Amino acid sequence: MSNHVNGVNGVNGVNGVKPVFPENAASKEYAKALDAADPLASFRDKFIIPSKANIQSKRLAKPNISADPCIYFCGNSLGLQPKATAKYMEAHLDTWASIGVNGHFTKIEDSPLDPWWVMAEQAAGSMSKLVGAAPEEVIAMGTLTSNLHLLLASFYKPTATKHKILLDWKAFPSDHYAIESHIAWHDGLDPKKSMVLIGPDEGEYEIPTQKILSIIDEHADEAALILLPGIQYYTGQYFDINTITEYAHSKGLMVGWDLAHAFANVELKLHEWDVDFAVWCTYKYANAGPGSMGGLFVHEKHGKVDYSQGEDSPQFRHRLAGWYGGDRSVRFKMDNKFRPIPGAGGFQLSTSSATDLTCLNASLSIFDQTSISELRRKSVQLTAYLEYLLLKDTTDETRPFRIITPSNPEERGAQLSLLLKPGLLQRVADKLQSASIVCDKREPGVVRVAPAPLYNTYSEVWQFVEQLKAAFQE
């Protein structure tokens, strides 16, 4: 598609077609024109953007919304605070203060929150739309690694012959530790022999889908499960979840996905893609706050509860159980007969933190006002504009960095990972910090830049590239 707004030739295409920019696209005026034509521009006002002064301060400071804002491209690490968070938190605290324990079951008419005991389901309803699932297949609970442990306990069923887990060569350390510990938990299994790392070719960072399928073929007779990141945290590569899941299933593997960097970033269709299970955090692109409550997905085929053998003999997928996973209709009978909630809710353990769920529901209320497809459309354009400006008037030989994130929009999310030439990382990081630009650096030489469609602008992308070029020239 082509947009012509205010005389500006807009970007073309989203679905696998890289946006194309005109000759004048490298100008500040063009970036401003893109912002003026942005249908999601008003969402920026729903967030508190740290001021340049505050971002440099080492003392507590009240947010100064009218002040000169910093450029915040670190939503892949921690998203910004929604203005709704304070409103929701005030309602939660007032509920607790005014009616105490009755907050568990009482619906306050003028509160944006449901009673505490169903707030996890309130969040699940919103999250299900972001992952392409039925609400019953999703639940808000725990944190990413604890949820991963719970699901590995249910889905990793090694035998003497099928015991291997296939995983990413540069998996986030917590995923690696979780897998390693589950393998070691089973007598006779050695993580060194049962963990298969899938990596790129020498000198490369992108892992082609065909290579993943080939490794599945190579280990199919011995592999029990594959766990990959939806988006690789270091390189920003977005894996072909549908193709990999379907192929792994055809070889008899269970399939799980860590969606830490994919949730609220790219469009997902977990139910349609027949994913067995998935986990994610909510403090990155979902903006629910540092260490906020995570989420998990269990496909409906694994969440069924069968009472054909009697009310006291439900048949269900084995899991590590807790009382909050019990059916609400009988939860308070306290008869020590576990009857799980059908679906993902049956994997809950303890009473959910209403305080954490308050922050999560506040952030999700913003997503309820748009759609992941609309956000993704802008994200593709923002990141393509960033890539365009970074590469303009340079060659592989002249530029002091390499973009190790795939260039195809279908194979990446919001993030671009820049691998700097040796010795540049700290200098560039210091320059960006002094300019009140917040992005993420990863040793030994990567800067991860992630413009978020909810609150970042094309003008900020332009300013970032100007500051980055200045840092290289110093």
UniProtKB/Swiss-Prot annotation:
Residues annotated for pyridoxal 5'-phosphate binding in this entry: 144-145, 172-175, 258, 261, 283, 323, 351
GO molecular function, one term: kynureninase activity
GO cellular component: cytoplasm
Keyword Hydrolase included in the entry's annotation: yes
Pfam families: Aminotran_5 (PF00266), KYNU_C (PF22580)
EC number(s) from the headed UniProt entry: 3.7.1.3
N6-(pyridoxal phosphate)lysine found at: 284
Secretion signal, residue range per the UniProt entry: none
The organism's place on the tree of life at top rank: Eukaryota
Enzyme class: hydrolase
InterPro entries: Aminotrans_V_dom, Kynureninase, PyrdxlP-dep_Trfase, PyrdxlP-dep_Trfase_major, PyrdxlP-dep_Trfase_small
Compartment(s) where it occurs, according to its Swiss-Prot or TrEMBL record: Cytoplasm
Pathway(s): Amino-acid degradation; L-kynurenine degradation; L-alanine and anthranilate from L-kynurenine: step 1/1; Cofactor biosynthesis; NAD(+) biosynthesis; quinolinate from L-kynurenine: step 2/3
Reactions the enzyme catalyzes: L-kynurenine + H2O = anthranilate + L-alanine + H(+); 3-hydroxy-L-kynurenine + H2O = 3-hydroxyanthranilate + L-alanine + H(+)
PANTHER family: KYNURENINASE, KYNURENINASE 2
Role summary: Catalyzes the cleavage of L-kynurenine (L-Kyn) and L-3-hydroxykynurenine (L-3OHKyn) into anthranilic acid (AA) and 3-hydroxyanthranilic acid (3-OHAA), respectively.
Subunit structure: Homodimer.
Family: Belongs to the kynureninase family.
Protein name in the entry: Kynureninase 2
Organism listed in the record: Emericella nidulans (strain FGSC A4 / ATCC 38163 / CBS 112.46 / NRRL 194 / M139)
